[in-house]
Amino acid sequence: YHQLDAVRKVVAAGRAEGPGQNYLIQHSAGSGKTNSISWLSHRLASLHDAGDRKVFDCVVVITDRRVLDQQLQDAIYQIEHAQGVVKAIDQDSKQLAAALIDGTKIVITTLQKFPFVLRGLLHAAGAETQEKATAEERAQAKAWESEIAKRRYAVIVDEAHSSQTGETARELKAILGAGAVEDAEGETDWED
């Protein structure tokens, strides 16, 4: 029950305040963090404000493990099986770039893939390598980068205490746009 209560509070705040806010849900070991993350990701992916406008274009679930947490993936997939709703990024930055381009509602990835997204955009545009990219391929990648930065993201970070510092976190913020993820100051804390 405490997981559902925390999810409801974050969803209500997200509906009222919109993107660009920070919330912290603290869980003790074995208290249902996976449930909270999976329920929250689906609720935020379909969240609309009081004017019936979609609040977030995409929910990005980030784990700091280099190999995606299978339990977390399974929990998120169990809720929604429709094609294109959930995409686990278990290969490379090209796969992450494609998910951000095609409008996937929920993207599950590791933090380590974000520094390479721009290279993935070039590859998705048809370039074999960054050095061999044509002007047209670079222009397409730049257009996608601009489009990605304009979208509104909800970013759910598993183990946020170890994931939100350093160069990789700054690159995540740069790719998803300035308003997508703010520094973890002044955040609301709902403790479990």
Question: Positions of the model-derived regions?
Answer:
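RecA-like P-loop NTPase motor core of helicase/translocase proteins
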Residues: 1-192
